[in-house]
Amino acid sequence: MKRLFTSESVTEGHPDKMCDQISDAILDAILAKDSNARVACETCTTTGLVMVMGEISTNCYVDIPKVVRETVREIGYDRAKYGFDCDTCSVMTTIDEQSADIAMGVDEALESKKGQKDEVEAVGAGDQGMMFGFATNETDAYMPLPIYMAHKLSRRLTEVRKDGTLDYLRPDGKTQVTVEYENNKPKRIDTIVISTQHGEEVSLETIEKDIKEHVINAVVPAELLDAETRYFINPTGRFVVGGPQGDSGLTGRKIIVDTYGGYGRHGGGAFSGKDSTKVDRSAAYAARWVAKNLVAAGIADKLEIQLAYAIGVAKPVSIEIETFGTGKMPEDKIVEIVEKVFDLRPGAIIRDLDLRKPIFKQTAAYGHFGRTDLDLPWERLNKIEEIKKYI
């Protein structure tokens, strides 16, 4: 049976991704000085303006406008002709402390209040909600091929812009990859869509030629392309106005790009700007860690895990496994293995994945999972042997 599946990615200059990076840059700047800070930092941007808002409880000082401007400069919006200038844009901040009612449940979990005096039990989930983790063995990164290739294309777009290979490119851009599957195995790439912001002086013909040569052919394996593969490069014909000048941006509006490209389910909670007591982030990272190690251990070819939490309670209220018919054992038995091998209380996740460190800004563009260019704790295959003891 043949089917098509599509995923998209965006470059770091996309306005929503700008906001994710700004929020995580602020988070990292605070964690570098105060590893126990509570941060929920949201950013929005539009023409000539960045606004940072949220709840932050910390004993340190961070120059937020400076962090904002440095981040925007790194992305590449450093002159007016790009539609946004890091030095002249307005930066507004409106920050409050974390709600005392929320802090009460995070500082001391329900289990701890009931006498279970354990350092890990002391940290309650920062909110209710469900989080999903996913892994598949169809790529070496244990990621679905559509999102994996879309990210590679968007990263390459940024590389050729920053290294001067295609110096007429501007920071904003999007990629999309459609993969044809046969019998649930990726067979070929059916369609590639790339939209990239550019200077006024360059022709569409030049852009099409250069993108195929320096972006697509540089990162997409030739065996995945054939004479029937379709290419849509700047299909509107012009993309000069981009970034915050073209669209407003907001933290947390690219949650499918951040995860599995729609191939796996999503609980709805965004990642960027949140410290690790927020299970939206830490439990989603843990879920990926669990799923990847289970697939690498041979328990399934494709696996999704759902975790769910209650605010102020340490232990997950539920754990569910789905193997899509690829499992080598019943799913309830896999749940039992997960409970034996992994401690999924927020305090344990923070400890085991070392999530009090300022490591988050680097994840805020090009995906939080399957990052072969980074050494992220939740991507490590360090539980395989322990899992195999129970198979």
From Swiss-Prot:
**Any GO BP annotation:** one-carbon metabolic process
| UniProt: ATP binding residues | H14, D172, G173, K174, R238, F239, D247, R253, K254, A270, K274
In terms of Pfam families, this protein maps to: S-AdoMet_synt_C, S-AdoMet_synt_M, S-AdoMet_synt_N
- Per the record, which residues fall in region Flexible loop? 98-108
Q: Which InterPro entries match?
A: ADOMET_SYNTHASE_CS, S-AdoMet_synt_C, S-AdoMet_synt_central, S-AdoMet_synt_N, S-AdoMet_synthetase, S-AdoMet_synthetase_sfam
Give the UniProt entry's GO cellular component terms: cytoplasm
Where can this protein be found? Cytoplasm
Q: Which residues bind Mg(2+)?
A: D16
Q: Which pathway, metabolic or otherwise, does it act in?
A: Amino-acid biosynthesis; S-adenosyl-L-methionine biosynthesis; S-adenosyl-L-methionine from L-methionine: step 1/1
Q: Write out the residues that bind L-methionine.
A: E55, Q98, D247, K278
Which family does the similarity line name? Belongs to the AdoMet synthase family.
Instruction: Describe, as the record does, how this protein assembles with itself and its partners.
Output: Homotetramer; dimer of dimers.
Its job: Catalyzes the formation of S-adenosylmethionine (AdoMet) from methionine and ATP. The overall synthetic reaction is composed of two sequential steps, AdoMet formation and the subsequent tripolyphosphate hydrolysis which occurs prior to release of AdoMet from the enzyme.
PANTHER family recorded: S-ADENOSYLMETHIONINE SYNTHETASE
This protein is called S-adenosylmethionine synthase
The protein's organism comes out as Clostridium botulinum (strain Alaska E43 / Type E3)
Q: What is the lineage of its organism?
A: Bacteria, Bacillati, Bacillota, Clostridia, Eubacteriales
Gene behind the chain: metK
